């Protein structure tokens, strides 16, 4: 995957694809996922929805995998994480959707914000403006947030027998590719402890 993601526009597309994958799979979302080749059409909407609920919400007798940073990093306290995320979003005038019920620390929200930063970087380069503030913000956001909790999230997700387990490695590769592009000597997120 790393060879394919060498520019901010491609990274944004990758983050948005992962955001779609980890969003609740209602019928419309399932159609978009199958049309874009992100989900095998043989996996019916009903099955994908049941897999989502079992993996992330109800567990079906097993522990669920939380999609929230604050629940994956209890040592830091969720309130502090939420406040820091809101400051990140406010600094860049990134508004959370009034219709969206997700919290600022939801995986999908964080993925969408990273996609937005990548698109801002792309626009700055295209327009001859300084793109470095967007690169620094993405580096900082990854270090402080997504890359900090992704290894544990992946470990738990990949330990499930859910259809969603297959997306953990792809998400890890995307984040590694982005951090590498930003010049980070990132620990390998794929090497789970």
Swiss-Prot record:
Q: Which UniProt keywords apply?
A: Chaperone, Cytoplasm
Entry's localization field: Cytoplasm
Q: Where is the signal peptide?
A: none
Q: Which domain of life is it from?
A: Bacteria
Gene Ontology cellular-component annotations: cytoplasm
Q: Which InterPro entries match?
A: DMSO/NO3_reduct_chaperone (IPR020945), DMSO_Rdtase_II_chaperone (IPR017843), TorD-like_sf (IPR036411), TorD/DmsD_chaperones (IPR050289)
Where this protein primarily resides, as one coarse class? cytoplasm
Task: Report the protein name in the record.
Answer: Selenate reductase assembly chaperone protein
Q: Which organism is it from?
A: Thauera selenatis
């Amino acid at each position: 995957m790393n060879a394919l993601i060498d520019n901010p526009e491609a990274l944004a597309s990758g983050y948005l694809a992962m955001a779609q994958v980890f969003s609740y799979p209602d019928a419309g979302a399932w159609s978009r996922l199958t049309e874009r080749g992100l989900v095998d059409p043989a996996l019916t909407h009903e099955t994908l929805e049941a897999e989502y609920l079992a993996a992330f919400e109800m567990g079906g007798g097993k522990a669920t995998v939380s999609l929230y940073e604050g629940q994956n990093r209890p040592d830091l306290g969720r309130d502090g994480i939420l406040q820091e995320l809101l400051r990140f979003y406010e600094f860049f005038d990134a508004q959370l959707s009034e219709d969206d019920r997700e919290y600022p620390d939801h995986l999908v929200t964080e993925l969408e914000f990273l996609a937005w930063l990548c698109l801002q970087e792309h626009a700055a380069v295209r327009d001859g403006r300084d793109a470095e503030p967007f690169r620094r913000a993405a580096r900082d956001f990854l270090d402080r947030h997504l890359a900090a909790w992704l290894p544990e999230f992946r470990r738990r997700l990949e330990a499930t027998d859910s259809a969603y387990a297959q997306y953990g490695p792809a998400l890890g590769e995307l984040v590694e590719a982005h951090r590498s592009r930003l010049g980070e000597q990132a620990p390998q997120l794929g090497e789970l402890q």
